[in-house]
Amino acid sequence: MEVAMVCTRVNLLILILSLCSPYKFIQSPMDFGPLNLLPTTTTASSDFGRILFHSPSAVLKPQAPRDISLLLSFLSASPLGKVTVAARGAGHSIHGQAQALDGIVVEMSSLPSEIEFYRRGEGDVSYADVGGGIMWIELLEQSLKLGLAPRSWTDYLYLTIGGTLSNAGISGQTFKHGPQISNVLQLEVVTGRGEIVTCSPTKDAELFNAVLGGLGQFGIITRARILLQEAPQKVKWVRAFYDDFATFTKDQELLVSMPVLVDYVEGFIVLNEQSLHSSSIAFPTNVDFNPDFGTKNNPKIYYCIEFAVHDYQNKNINVEQVVEVISRQMSHIASHLYSVEVSYFDFLNRVRMEEMSLRNSGLWEVHHPWLNMFVPSAGISDFRDLLMDSISPDNFEGLILIYPLLRHKWDTNTSVVLPDSGSTDQVMYAVGILRSANPDDGCSHHCLQELLLRHRRLAGAAASGLGAKQYLAHHPTPAGWRRHFGRRWERFADRKARFDPRCILGPGQGIFPRDSSSSNGAFASYS
């Protein structure tokens, strides 16, 4: 065993030296004992955004957290080179955040996929211990067999546990239960130093809080303990249409003020026939809404609130009556409220149907120049105006989500960045501009760059004028990241110095470019 470990260490040192060399030695699969290091793949250099393509020098397919630990321990201790490491989950990033140019990509899906469930376990709560490379859809499928499910979700479930927890993880349940990072009891993390640490709010809390929403900068999540609740059997799914933005947001804020009755709240802008049709694919009932969208020079814009009420099939609660009580307080367009009952699984997995429709049309694997932002409620109307000035409603392809979140459901000890709050502004909005750009429809490289430029200008204006912050942020320079973090930068940088002082992890974010020229460690120029 000791001989094998020595051989592994020697071979890994050879790998590091080859990576630091100006020549490329990794041209064929290599087996370094327990470390399965492979040459780069197309998958490792691409993501859902299809905007950036940065090829690594090698791919690690770990069989256990110890493999990741061994790799990072060597890189952290090595005085040579500037090799970086990125953890890749489902590859759903937009701007190459999980890529590592000339570095090493860790394929998290290679980790063991066991899920352990505990009903009414420690602390009198139910939870699941799940690997960081497992997708949320897998956790849902297994937990439902026990009548349980996580409380907080993302809209799309084919994302990894570790990936969403490294950002925040939001959806229509966030107003009620907080983001996914507020529903974690414990983590197993491999730090940038190569240490395997089990952390929680009461044990190694600084690492626990750093990693949650930490953009992969402090450690790689290899296991998480996710809080569970009783799963409903059915969901009453409701949509209501509006022709006035102020009324739309007023009703959204009304709904999130009723967490006892309402379980999910989102909303979206209806710009044109295409957006109305695509948003209706997963909604399994007839929507008899045929609005006048005006003309190109004088467009008419509509809005849709989507909310849901869980149905536990309890005879003491009539879900139809609950929806009636809620809807009577709303001010939607008369006769344009629609509802349908679906299974809990189908409701949570609703985006999958839209995905399959796009795949069948050849429109899934196209460019996705998305922009996601958190906007203070006081500025949401002004943001809407900025947004409409930056797009053409008649030819916009994609979805624009707008829905409210409640600040007190977020733990500010984590690394996530929220807009600074006023004394009374406890509501903020999640806005997702989820557009597609299809080269086959004429959106060439120039077209894509123009869309990205528009988004940068919109994000910049919203940040400087409204105090908005990017979610799933992309900033091309470290200076841009400093502005993004604002007063939170010092804490973020201190955490980097503590847990990943050589700046090995998360190179695709571009927050801490690794500098091999400093003998005191790569972090010296950022502290």
Curated annotation (Swiss-Prot):
One of its GO terms (biological process) is cytokinin metabolic process. GO terms for molecular function: cytokinin dehydrogenase activity; FAD binding; oxidoreductase activity. It comes from the Eukaryota. One of its GO terms (cellular component) is endoplasmic reticulum. Disruption phenotype: Increased leaf erectness, asymmetric growth and development of lamina joint. Residues 52-231 form the FAD-binding PCMH-type domain. Coiled coil: none annotated. The modification Pros-8alpha-FAD histidine is found at residue 92. InterPro entries: Cytok_DH_C_sf (IPR016170), Cytokinin_DH_FAD/cytokin-bd (IPR015345), FAD-bd_PCMH (IPR016166), FAD-bd_PCMH-like_sf (IPR036318), FAD-bd_PCMH_sub1 (IPR016167), FAD-bd_PCMH_sub2 (IPR016169), FAD-linked_Oxase-like_C (IPR016164), FAD-linked_Oxidoreductases_BP (IPR050432). FAD binds at residues 87, 89, 91, 93, 97, 155, 160, 166, 170, 221, 471, 509. It holds the Pfam family FAD_binding_4. Its cofactor is FAD. Expressed in inflorescence meristems. Highly expressed in lamina joints, and mainly in the parenchyma cells and vascular bundles on the abaxial side of the lamina joint. Expressed in roots, stems, leaves and young panicles. It is an enzyme of class 1 (oxidoreductase). SUPFAM superfamilies: FAD-binding/transporter-associated domain-like, FAD-linked oxidases, C-terminal domain. Induction: Induced by isopentenyladenine, trans-zeatin and 24-epibrassinolide. PROSITE patterns: FAD_PCMH (PS51387). It catalyses: N(6)-dimethylallyladenine + A + H2O = 3-methyl-2-butenal + adenine + AH2. Glycans are attached at residue 413. It is found in: Endoplasmic reticulum. Residues 1-22 form the signal peptide. Keywords: Endoplasmic reticulum, FAD, Flavoprotein, Glycoprotein, Oxidoreductase, Signal. PANTHER family: CYTOKININ DEHYDROGENASE 3, GULONOLACTONE OXIDASE. Catalyzes the oxidation of cytokinins, a family of N(6)-substituted adenine derivatives, where the substituent is an isopentenyl group. Cytokinins are plant hormones essential for plant growth, development, and stress responses. Exhibits specific activities toward trans-zeatin (tZ) and isopentenyladenine (iP). Plays a role in lamina joint inclination. Regulates cell proliferation and vascular bundle number on the abaxial side of lamina joint. Belongs to the oxygen-dependent FAD-linked oxidoreductase family. This is Cytokinin dehydrogenase 3. It comes from Oryza sativa subsp. japonica.
